[in-house]
């Protein structure tokens, strides 16, 4: 998909899938963050105000007001209707991905696996209710691998209420986010049980009686 078709993807695909949609204009984000003395990745921040997007359904009129002509990315907000994401950083290991999908009870060719624009990580989108290890509202929790898996990935971020970047958004490297197994998913993300997430953490991150985590 081309970036100049972002509005079409937003209005006629992601929004119809049930997502609340954001748009990303890096140049506008840089100016805004500079004025507010903030340091954020301009390719990952929503340009529009996304306050309450995790609890209130977005209207079509709201999306129509966005500057899609200049947008370089599209996103959504985790938390709405239980939409979640796992962000595996520092990994291109297909064996790891297969293991994770199996533990989570997802098909091996799961449609909602996204290859990061960095080409050094992947995201898995799914639905899930409350999960005690996921962190607090508007904060992410990061887990690090145990010794057995330290060469497989750098960390896992639980994106529970935060901003998610969606294909075909532009990454700062100049690459685009892409779905791994399909051009675009046909079905909505699947439901993952909390106990499967717990099993994944114990397999990949548990060591010496606890988890090595950072709260952001």
Where are the regions that the model predicts?
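Conserved phosphate/metal-binding and DNA-contacting active-site motifs used
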Residues: 1-216
């Amino acid at each position: 998909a081309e970036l100049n078709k972002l509005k079409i993807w937003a209005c006629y695909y992601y929004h119809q899938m049930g997502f609340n949609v954001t748009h990303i204009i890096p140049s506008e984000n840089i100016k805004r963050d500079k004025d507010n003395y903030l340091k954020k990745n301009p390719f990952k921040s929503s340009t529009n105000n996304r306050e309450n997007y995790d609890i209130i359904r977005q209207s079509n009129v709201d999306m129509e007001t966005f500057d899609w002509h200049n947008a370089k990315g599209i996103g959504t907000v985790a938390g709405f209707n239980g939409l979640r994401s796992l962000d595996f950083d520092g990994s291109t290991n297909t064996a790891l991905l297969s293991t994770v999908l199996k533990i989570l009870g997802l098909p091996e060719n799961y449609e909602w696996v996204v290859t990061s624009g960095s080409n050094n990580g992947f995201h898995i989108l799914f639905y899930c209710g409350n999960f005690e290890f996921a962190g607090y509202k508007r904060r992410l929790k990061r887990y690090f691998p145990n010794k057995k898996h330290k060469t497989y990935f750098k960390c896992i971020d639980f994106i529970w209420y935060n901003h998610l970047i969606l294909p075909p958004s532009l990454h700062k490297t100049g690459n685009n986010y892409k779905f791994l197994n399909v051009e675009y998913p046909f079905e909505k993300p699947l439901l993952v049980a909390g106990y499967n997430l717990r099993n994944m953490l114990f397999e990949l991150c548990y060591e010496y009686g606890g988890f090595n985590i950072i709260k952001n």
